[in-house]
Amino acid sequence: MPKSVFDKFCCFAIAMKKKYKYSPNADISAAGGIVRVIVGLFLVLVLLFWGGAVQAGPLAERLAQFPQWEGFPPVKVAEGDLVYPDWMEGTWNVTSTLVEQVAPLAPDVVTPGFESNRRYLNQPVNFLVRFQAVSPPLSTLFGRFIPLKPFSESKNLAPAKLNSHVVVADRAFNGLNIARAYLGDRAIQSVKVDPNSPNRQITSLSTGRQLVSIVTGRAAEIPTPEQFIATEVSNQVFRGTSRPYFNQVETTTAYQLRQLPSLAIEAWQVTAVYLSPQDADYFKAQARPVALYRYRLELLPVEAGVSQPVDRVR
């Protein structure tokens, strides 16, 4: 970290400490606000200098600003699949921990299930995920690993690679394992991905209800060769009830490859829920997220041969 930036951060922290050190009657919420500011600045610095002094892209800045999100991330229309770095290829054992959840518009607007999700706070959840190499169309090869401008102008970006394959998520495998980890094996009947589009996925519950998820937009950044940040925005509809429920979901994740002391991937992930135009409170929200969930992820490699059967659309 450049000394000048680090010194400025230290001076700011010391000044805040002096300001509040001898104020026993200071308003707790005000002090909490200062703490959040300091933590936010620290996260900005971490994302700026995580693995080297590089220019932060819009997704890195967005994660650092959590939970002060006022709208959707900058995305492009989703075409094809999300391409991951080659170092993510393989099967991984994931430990996911919900560390924070926020309802920015409460008590006026609270999503169904927000309160019940508190039972997952600080509770590690384990499941398998798989990223596999596939042969892509030529257009995908030329477009891989190209982030949004102006971040793409950074000299610290890894160059595009013209390999004979690209790495993508096994969405059916991953979706099934994640759903069963949170809801139980008996609750999930199947997870199917449209063979003509990786952006359309159907999760069928044992009760006969369905969750249809369609990825509509995405973006990605590569600050350094060992970092990867991606976001996807999806339209979701819950079927099987007397009144279908619609919403929009954003998932933004920052991955960091760790090779010492042992191979692993560490990540921070934020899931944001937005109301759809069909919701009665849509204009109250005004495109702001109504629920935010922040997770800490650790991915450890699994030996070859560890797998789990999944259903696919035929």
Language-model regions: role of each:
Residues 59-86, 94-314:
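Soluble ligand-binding/transfer domains with enclosed cavities or grooves
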Residues 5, 9, 19-41:
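Bacterial N-terminal signal peptides that target proteins for export
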Residues 13-15:
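Elongated, amphipathic alpha-helical interaction scaffolds
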Residues 43-47:
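Hydrophobic core
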Residues 54-58:
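Boundary at the C-terminal end of the N-terminal hydrophobic targeting segment
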